[in-house]
Amino acid sequence: MRKRKLLTAFISSLLLMTHQTARAQELEAKVTINRAQVSDTKGDVFESLEKKVTEFLNDQKWTELKLRDKEKIQCNFNITVNTYSDTDNSFTCTLLVTSSRPVYDATYMTTAFSNRDPQFNFKFQEHARLEFRPEQIDNQLVALLAYYAYMIIGIDLDTMSPMGGTDILNRAEEIVTAGQTLDYPGWK
């Protein structure tokens, strides 16, 4: 009886660890929405935006890489909302995105990627789903987030080996090409 309990506990812990590793995606993104410049609006849409963007970045499987939780790429998406229209759900924002990685054989991190995007503009409805389909780029917010996710991953891989992120950076370039059809000036 005791052996059976030990065996059950052992198998359960193995399954839990396997599930945790299999679920781990490439990014560990922290998303912050700064809406100080926007007044007279309900905060629900901003909270929903922050939650959905965080889930989208962290839960999406961007590549075929298999990473453990501690190997995820640390990144920050700081979105400053300059204007918001609740009539057409449009956001005019500035994005500051950064990623960092551990310095080899050290205990500290260094910045691998940093970019300020003054034209981070999109439409977002509070209950809409963010879904990435590489073969059909039809949502501005999803395209922007996917572009930056691929940039972060590609550059991170480049820091580990020369041209190591080329394939992933090519995916970012494909999004730029597809983004031309979205009628937002930032892609041109």
Where are the predicted features?
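Bacterial N-terminal signal peptides
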Residues: T8-T18
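Acidic/His-rich structured neighborhood in mature extracellular/periplasmic domains
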Residues: T92-K188
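Start-of-domain marker
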Residues: Q25-T92, V103
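Positively charged n-region of N-terminal signal peptides that target proteins for export
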Residues: M1-K5
